Regions:
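Alpha-helical segment of the N-proximal tetratricopeptide repeat
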Residues: 31-61, 65
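Active-site nucleophilic cysteine motif
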Residues: 323-330, 364-379
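Secretory targeting signatures
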Residues: 1-32, 405
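Low-complexity, Gly/Ser/Thr/Pro-rich intrinsically disordered linker/tail segments
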Residues: 439-505
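Hydrophobic/aromatic-rich core segments of domains that either
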Residues: 41, 45, 370-465
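Acidic low-complexity segments
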Residues: 47, 239-243, 255-358, 362
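Intrinsically disordered, low-complexity N-terminal segments that are enriched in acidic
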Residues: 80-274
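Conserved small-residue packing positions in alpha-helical repeats and bundles
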Residues: 36, 43, 63, 76, ...
Length: 505
């Protein structure tokens, strides 16, 4: 028997509402609720019930209705609600039968009972929506990350372990006494290009764009912003000494000519390898009244210090009191959890405001951003200043957005680590256990120079504030856009249209 879903009931209710609004009954005339309001209300109900496909359709219908009636503010609100629902639809594209078919095709030799064990939602992060179970677009990748026999067979077949093979020369190189903590500088020159087809853009209104740029840090020096184009539309820049690198532009859409709207950046910087040799006995005392100490030991949106997290931190460090040893204990605990690509859309859609540090604590799942936020939260819970840095990695062949973390030790400064890159040692098909341990040890307090830093910590707001609930504010690594006259959230186009190339010079 075919199940009657709630969307069928909603459809009937909408038809009734439309009949009443059209005056097709003999009821006394009253001030009607607009069809847009009805559609929006039912869309919100579907959204709250996790029926994201239905919610997306209803919000789009509401947007179209509001647009036709000239209510631009309501149309924009409906568009933004549709965007959040659509993010869920796009991140969860596969139903049960589809994901089973994909898993069988990708892992034909794995026993059926083992494959079935991967699919419960507490293992796969699946959701129930619109009467079906839907699976994350990253499900196949996560299966590989969670099963080292599969991952090592895969790297053996390729004859290469991503990240590990490229970075072993740094991790295994002996430190040079007296060379300092910032060594082996590499100068990089980068270009960024955002290209949006003109036919996607309306002819009126303004496209507001926040474009990422490099900033100065302890390891990233000599930052030069060579150009940002079109320069005539730049409204502000944060500068290279800020905590976040941004060029903000306002582009009149009436000025767009040709086949595409193009926004470009060009920049140069020098990145240093960071190498530390820390004597726990020489770690100084914190000045707990210092503004920087207070800043990096306080909670933020995604680095939360809940009672449960504080308890977890205490369980990890035990009776240890030395900040360095505590940070090391936290690092080794975090890298024991398998790398996992989560659904950021799910966290945004839930509207619960669940911090990423809590998501990792509760689920055990996290990617580079989530794990770095979790590490920072655990350190802060123990009175150790910590932060999560965002930007790009330029590891040859594996370039892309990336996040890692740092903790502060008096007498030494900011100590880097990269829990995600460290976990890559487990993927190696030919490394010994001793080599894996040596590699992980390197990334507990050192860092390679294949980095491009855009933001010094999680939750640093964009300047100016876009006041856009569809944007995740955890990290700023790719451009963000806001356009009140665009029929579709421009960030869908920006994600597809942004390209970065960074090369050694």
């Amino acid at each position: 028997m075919k199940r009657i879903t709630s969307i069928s009931i909603i459809t009937v209710l909408l038809l009734i509402a439309i009949i009443f609004v059209a005056g097709c009954t003999s009821s006394p005339a009253t001030t009607p609720v607009s069809n847009g309001d009805t559609l929006l209300s039912h869309g919100e109900t579907e959204f709250q019930n996790n029926n994201f496909h239905a919610a997306d359709r209803l919000f789009v219908l509401a947007q179209e209705n509001y647009t036709a009636s000239g209510n631009t503010a309501a149309a924009l609100d409906a568009r933004d609600r549709a965007s959040i629902a659509r993010m869920m639809v796009l991140e969860y594209p596969y139903n049960r039968s589809q994901i089973e078919e994909m898993i069988n095709a990708r892992f034909p030799d794995i026993p059926a009972d083992r494959k079935a064990s991967w699919l419960p939602c507490d293992k796969s992060q699946c959701i129930e929506s619109d009467g079906e179970f839907w699976y994350l677009d990253k499900t196949i990748s996560n299966i590989q990350y969670h099963n080292m026999d599969i991952m090592r067979n895969m790297t053996a077949a390729k004859g290469e372990t991503p990240f590990y093979d490229q970075l072993v020369p740094y991790a295994f190189a002996p430190a040079v006494p007296g060379s300092g903590n910032y060594v082996n500088p590499v100068t990089w020159e980068g270009t960024g290009l955002l290209s949006i087809p003109s036919d996607k853009l309306p002819k009126t209104g303004t496209l507001r764009i926040w474009v990422p740029l490099p900033i100065e840090t302890e390891s990233q020096k000599n930052v030069t912003i060579i150009s940002v184009e079109p320069a005539q539309y730049i409204k502000s820049q944060t500068g290279t000494n800020a905590d976040i690198g941004i060029a903000y532009l306002e582009i009149p859409l009436a000025s767009v000519t040709g086949n595409s709207l193009n926004v470009s950046t060009k920049f140069r910087f020098t990145e240093y390898e960071q190498r530390f040799s820390i004597d726990p006995a020489k770690v100084g005392n914190y000045n707990t009244s210092d503004p920087e100490y207070l800043k990096y030991t306080s909670p933020s949106g995604n680095i939360a210090l809940t009672p449960e997290l504080k308890q977890k931190a205490r369980e990890i460090v035990g009776n240890e009191t030395n900040p360095y040893r505590k940070a090391q204990k936290i690092y080794w605990d975090v890298i024991s959890q398998p790398y996992t690509l989560p659904s950021y859309a799910r966290i945004l859609a839930n509207g619960t405001g669940q911090p990423m540090s809590e998501y990792v604590r509760i689920t055990g799942y996290g990617d580079c951003g989530a794990q770095s936020a979790y590490f920072a939260a655990l350190c802060r819970a123990e009175g150790i200043p910590a932060r999560a840095l965002g930007g790009q990695q330029m590891i040859p062949g594996f370039e892309g957005v990336h996040i890692w973390s740092e903790y502060y030790l008096p007498g030494y400064g900011w100590i880097p680590n990269d829990v995600t890159v460290a976990e890559g040692a487990e993927w190696s098909y030919n490394a010994t256990d001793a080599e894996r341990q040596q590699y992980k040890k390197y990334y507990s307090e050192n860092l390679d120079p294949y980095r491009y830093i855009i933001v010094k910590d999680a939750d640093i707001p964009l300047v100016p504030d876009p006041e856009d609930r569809t944007m995740s504010d955890m990290f700023f690594e790719i451009p963000k856009g806001r356009c009140d006259t665009c029929p579709v959230d421009p960030n869908f186009w920006i994600t597809d249209g942004w390209k970065v190339k960074i090369k050694k010079v």
